[in-house]
Swiss-Prot record:
Designated name of the protein: Gene 39 protein
Organism phylogeny: Viruses, Duplodnaviria, Heunggongvirae, Uroviricota, Caudoviricetes
Length: 139
């Protein structure tokens, strides 16, 4: 049976794989840019004036990723695209840390239960010895 943690890891792995297939995911960063609409026809249709470029980090070459976006949409898409690898890495780390803490808590609870049972046994033994002592003292 697959655990919730395994499901979460699988979900984030799929998300990362999808990100990795996006334009220039490994070698570029996405950058929004405001542009002039090329004709009045586009502005008549309500198309926006921002584009997204995939910019090669080494050569600064640009590939168009998206166009006709509002400034807010272009900024959001670029920000999210850039954040996904770190976000997924941190989510994996958080899941692993939570799992480790759960396991440590389980071990601590088991140790506590064992100590409690041992304590109960010792208290019972003390009562038995006190009873024997009382018996022999009264003779």
């Amino acid at each position: 049976m697959i655990t919730a943690d395994e499901q979460d890891h699988e979900f984030f792995d799929i998300l990362y794989q999808q990100w990795a297939k996006s334009t220039g995911a490994e070698k570029t960063y996405w950058m929004p840019e405001e542009v002039e609409p090329p004709s009045i026809c586009e502005t008549d249709h309500g198309l926006e004036d921002h584009v997204i470029w995939a910019v090669n980090q080494e050569t600064q070459d640009k590939d168009l990723v998206a166009s006709h976006l509002s400034e807010a949409d272009a900024d959001f898409i670029c920000g999210l695209h850039g954040a996904i690898p770190d976000l997924i890495r941190r989510l994996h780390e958080a899941i692993d840390e939570a799992t480790s803490k759960d396991e440590a808590r389980d071990r601590a609870e088991a140790n506590l239960a064992e100590a409690y049972l041992e304590n109960q046994g010792l208290q019972e033994r003390i009562r038995e010895l006190e009873s024997e002592l009382s018996y022999w003292s009264n003779r």
